[in-house]
Amino acid sequence: MGTTGARPSRRAVLTAAAGAAVAGIPLGGSTAFAAPRGNPDVLRQLRALEQEHSARLGVYARDTATGRTVLHRAEERFPMCSVFKTLAVAAVLRDLDRDGEFLATRLFYTEQEVKDSGFGPVTGLPENLAAGMTVERLCAAAICQSDNAAANLLLRELGGPEAVTRFCRSVGDRTTRLDRWEPELNSAEPGRLTDTTTPRAIGATYGELVLGDALAPRDRERLTGWLLANTTSTERFRKGLPADWTLGDKTGGGAYGTNNDAGVTWPPHRPPVVMVVLTTHDRPDAVADNPLVAKTAALLASALG
């Protein structure tokens, strides 16, 4: 899994993302699995991981340099959980902001709203409760710290969860749907259709947002910058990927041990890899399985790196 070369700088990654959009790198994934050279047993290893961890594992990974893909349960629905926050922020940037004016708008909220959201590490700080927060800071909190109250405030400005579904449809994603607010959207019952996506759908959408032209260049750079600054992936993608692969991602978790990570990673000196790992269980008492996500990321890096 070792990779030589210096880890790309944040500026280099943002520049490369802009270049990918201009170059029109194909992001939509092939329906066939192309076994990476030297590692024909990737699917077998993914099935073994699934059995080892008694989980349902969904995978979409696409090497934008070669078009090679790794797909496992890529068309099955999984609870989305906080992975949706990237979509909500992207919708705010595209549909509500004009030249940064809306991002500078200060929103006010109550302590009860933070408590009701279930998780507010940034919105719940006394100084933010007193003074409110700008939309720009709420976007950063929603992605970088996965702040639920920040996400709910953004959803409120958008007009509710269904606005995220409409946004997905507008960028070609006919699968991903958001129906509820935080924290109810994380209930993750097996078989539920609401608040779900598939590995292929969310992977293609993340790719369009970060590497495609779904957003204006300035908005794409902002969104990518927040994904690069994410703090919640330490035990998930970040632990499984080589240290010199730059990572911009968003995690998510909920009931039934649901544990997700989705984003884009930049190996040194080469185009990026879009990567999605979605996991869940059929037991309500199951706990989030970070090692499964990290091991899957390591396997994908080895296969496509």
Curated annotation (Swiss-Prot):
GO annotation, biological process: beta-lactam antibiotic catabolic process; response to antibiotic
Residues given in the record as substrate binding sites: 250-252
Name used for this protein in its record: Beta-lactamase
Active site: 82 (acyl-ester intermediate)
One GO MF term attached to the UniProt entry: beta-lactamase activity
Catalytic activity, as annotated: a beta-lactam + H2O = a substituted beta-amino acid
Protein keywords: Antibiotic resistance, Hydrolase, Signal
